[in-house]
């Protein structure tokens, strides 16, 4: 390939001929990592028929380097010994990088779709690929994203790390099982010798064990400590939501108390998503020192109002759950419908992630939340 390169101009070229052939692509188990999260393609759709020819993600490189290709990752899982195909995933690489770093622009390769911005230089970009310890970026585009494309949402990097640690612990347990069996036999011999010595000294260990078990049983049968918040003699603004209907303490939902759908209001802290919602609420010190405060007389009381502004990550699933609760009382049917759809998507995602066996052209992408944020403003007057 010439080092100088040429400017890309698609002209009237047909989209359907871009980088598609019947030949097999090369296999490589050490495939470089993409800078970006992948796209999951709706099953039954053809990526090359839907992908705009200038479909280059934003955020890396200069104007001349907005050129590259989408690389297919085929996936399947084994169900009762049968292979079940899963939706394809597509990863973006810049020209001169990735699993097809040696390919020229528009070379016909199986599982490769070439894209470029008009005016980009038709030469290797030298941008390289992502390091294993770096997070992948969320996908952003100038134009419209086809409806059949699902832009993968960033997940917690800690989850991937914990899965890896879990596998490592499993291997260690398997390797040490033989040593443990040997040590157990040795410990049993020592224990028997100690018990025999105690018996000679007149110590009845069996009776002591029975008394200990009896005390443990008595403790387990004792009354469980009542954890219900004591709200009766507290001001509204000092009360704590417990398990059950919160309208007893905070009243029905209205324009001045507009947070919570039917399920959340009816179940309080025992509602399914209450812990996730609580994580989205500012701390006491944040409210105290990060809010705008005003006060005025209201009969024999003082009415205090504060305005607090903070930001939540837009792509965080907890943020979506939190926003669903705002003014939910005013649109009950719409909220119920959205919750059913979200529950259905969640079950579908859980099924698709089980027993996934990718083919050789694959990468496991590391991901964290994007910095795009949404602004929340609270006004509390109670």
UniProtKB/Swiss-Prot annotation:
Residues 33-159 are annotated as: RNA-binding. Residues 231-334 are annotated as: Dimerization. InterPro entries: N_prot_C_CoV (IPR044344), N_prot_N_CoV (IPR044345), NCAP_aCoV (IPR042548), Nucleocap_CoV (IPR001218), Nucleocapsid_C (IPR037179), Nucleocapsid_N (IPR037195). Residues 31-153 form the CoV N NTD domain. The modification Phosphoserine is found at residues 9, 156, 254, 256. Residues 154-163 have a biased composition (Low complexity). ADP-ribosylated. The ADP-ribosylation is retained in the virion during infection. It is found in: Virion; Host endoplasmic reticulum-Golgi intermediate compartment; Host Golgi apparatus. Residues 201-235 have a biased composition (Basic and acidic residues). Residues 224-337 form the CoV N CTD domain. Residues 17-27, 164-176 have a biased composition (Basic residues). Signal peptide: none annotated. The keyword Oxidoreductase does not apply. Residues 1-29, 150-240, 328-358 are annotated as: Disordered. One of its GO terms (cellular component) is ribonucleoprotein complex. It comes from the Viruses. CDD domains: CoV_N-CTD (cd21595), CoV_N-NTD (cd21554). Keywords: ADP-ribosylation, Host Golgi apparatus, Phosphoprotein, Ribonucleoprotein, RNA-binding, Transcription, Transcription regulation, Viral nucleoprotein, Virion. Pfam families: CoV_nucleocap. Homooligomer. Both monomeric and oligomeric forms interact with RNA. Interacts with protein M. Interacts with NSP3; this interaction serves to tether the genome to the newly translated replicase-transcriptase complex at a very early stage of infection. HAMAP family: ALPHA_CORONA_NCAP. Belongs to the alphacoronavirus nucleocapsid protein family. Packages the positive strand viral genome RNA into a helical ribonucleocapsid (RNP) and plays a fundamental role during virion assembly through its interactions with the viral genome and membrane protein M. Plays an important role in enhancing the efficiency of subgenomic viral RNA transcription as well as viral replication. This is Nucleoprotein. It comes from Porcine transmissible gastroenteritis coronavirus (strain Purdue). The gene is N.
């Amino acid at each position: 390939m010439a080092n100088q390169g040429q400017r890309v101009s698609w002209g009237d070229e047909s989209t359907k001929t871009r980088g598609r052939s019947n030949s097999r692509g090369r296999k490589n188990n050490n495939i470089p990592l993409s800078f970006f999260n992948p796209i999951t393609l709706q099953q039954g759709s053809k990526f090359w028929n839907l992908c705009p020819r200038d479909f280059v993600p934003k955020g890396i490189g200069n104007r001349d380097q907005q050129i590259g290709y989408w690389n297919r990752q085929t996936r399947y899982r084994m169900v009762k010994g049968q292979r079940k195909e899963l939706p394809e995933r597509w990863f973006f690489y810049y020209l001169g990088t990735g699993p097809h770093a040696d390919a020229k622009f528009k070379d016909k390769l199986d599982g490769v779709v070439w894209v470029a911005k008009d005016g980009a230089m038709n030469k290797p970009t030298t941008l390289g690929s992502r390091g294993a310890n770096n997070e992948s970026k969320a996908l952003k585009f100038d134009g419209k994203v086809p409806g059949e494309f699902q832009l993968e949402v960033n997940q917690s990097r800690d989850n991937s790390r914990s899965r890896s640690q879990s596998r490592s612990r499993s291997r260690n347990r398997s390797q040490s099982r033989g040593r443990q069996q040997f040590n157990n036999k040795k410990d049993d011999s020592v224990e028997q010798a100690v018990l025999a010595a105690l018996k000679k000294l007149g110590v009845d260990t069996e009776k002591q064990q029975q008394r200990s078990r009896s005390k443990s049983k008595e403790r387990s049968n004792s009354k469980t400590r009542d954890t219900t918040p004591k709200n009766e003699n507290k001001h509204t603004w000092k009360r704590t939501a417990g398990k059950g209907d919160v309208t007893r303490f905070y009243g029905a939902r209205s324009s001045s108390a507009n947070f919570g759908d039917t399920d959340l209001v009816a179940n309080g802290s025992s509602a399914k998503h209450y812990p996730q919602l609580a994580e989205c609420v500012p701390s006491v010190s944040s409210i105290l020192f990060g809010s705008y405060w005003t006060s005025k007389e209201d009969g024999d009381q003082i009415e205090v109002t504060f305005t607090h502004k903070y930001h939540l990550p837009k792509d965080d699933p907890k943020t979506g759950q939190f926003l669903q609760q705002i003014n939910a009382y005013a649109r009950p049917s719409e909220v119920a419908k959205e919750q059913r759809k979200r529950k259905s998507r969640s079950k579908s995602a859980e099924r698709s992630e089980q027993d996934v066996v990718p083919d050789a052209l694959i990468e496991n992408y590391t991901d964290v939340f994007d910095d795009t944020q949404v602004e929340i403003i609270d006004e509390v007057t109670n």
